[in-house]
């Protein structure tokens, strides 16, 4: 049993395919990842961590404009899960996602993945709980199949709540690393719902700026809208995300 491809990862590929920066073959690889991968097992935990605490805080905050992220709670990854590094004042929470929640199956154990995100209060009380739980499981060495079963069971037992109204996320960072297949994503916003019809947003229709993905296992619907600026205020153009290197 293979773990489902992360909805965020699918969206990452969809964004770049729509913008013409990823070849069709790469998108197909996301849909059916090859079992031949350099990330067939968990790397040493230290490779998933960032030794520079200040650098991880700054990377997490880069997900949203400074006017939002400066007063947000910031979480950094410890050996057993996310830990609060900075207390927030405005209800937002920022963190740097790792491979277990941010990439495709073939890169489930890729220790290089770093995906900055800032969620609002509604998402912090719903969507973020799933991310933190999956991160704990990943650090504990759960296999993709085990994690897939665990998240479904936790939702069925109502240990993880449905999405709160208004739950959303800023992913506007120039920094980070989305994985070897699609290293850099466009600047975008995400909106989270529980079991919502994609058609209600006109998602994925010709000419629509809205990308949508529904996950029946997690009863989660995610909508994405690309925005025209990075979090630092500079203009987003097709290409810089793909050309930006670390």
Locate each region found by the language model:
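Bacterial N-terminal signal peptides that target proteins for export
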Residues: 1-12
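Primary mode marks residue(s) on the alpha4-beta5-alpha5 output face of response regulator receiver
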Residues: 31-246
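Boundary at the C-terminal end of the N-terminal hydrophobic targeting segment
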Residues: 25-31
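Bacterial N-terminal signal peptides
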Residues: 10-21
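Intrinsically disordered, low-complexity cationic segments
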Residues: 22-23, 245
């Amino acid at each position: 049993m293979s773990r489902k491809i992360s909805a965020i990862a699918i969206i990452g590929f969809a964004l770049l395919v729509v913008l013409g920066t990823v070849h069709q073959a790469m998108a197909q690889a996301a849909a059916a990842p090859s079992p031949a991968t350099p990330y067939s097992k968990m790397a040493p935990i230290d490779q998933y961590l960032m030794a520079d605490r200040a650098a991880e805080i700054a990377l997490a905050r880069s997900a949203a404009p400074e006017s939002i992220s400066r007063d947000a709670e910031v979480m950094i990854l410890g050996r057993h899960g996310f830990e609060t590094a900075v207390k927030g004042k405005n209800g937002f929470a920022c963190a740097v996602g790792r491979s277990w929640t941010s990439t495709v199956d073939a890169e489930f154990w890729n220790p290089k993945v770093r995906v900055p995100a800032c969620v609002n209060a509604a998402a912090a009380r719903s969507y973020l709980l799933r991310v933190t739980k999956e991160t704990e499981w990943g650090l504990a060495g759960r296999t993709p199949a085990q994690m897939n079963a665990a998240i479904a069971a936790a939702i069925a037992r109502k240990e993880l709540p449905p999405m709160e109204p208004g739950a959303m996320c800023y992913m506007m960072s120039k920094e980070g690393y989305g994985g070897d297949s699609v290293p850099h994503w466009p600047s975008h916003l995400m909106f989270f719902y529980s079991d919502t019809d994609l058609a209600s947003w006109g998602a994925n229709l010709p000419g629509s700026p809205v990308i949508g993905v529904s996950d029946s296992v997690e009863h989660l619907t995610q909508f994405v809208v690309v925005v025209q600026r990075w979090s630092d205020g500079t203009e987003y153009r097709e290409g810089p995300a793909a050309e930006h290197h670390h």
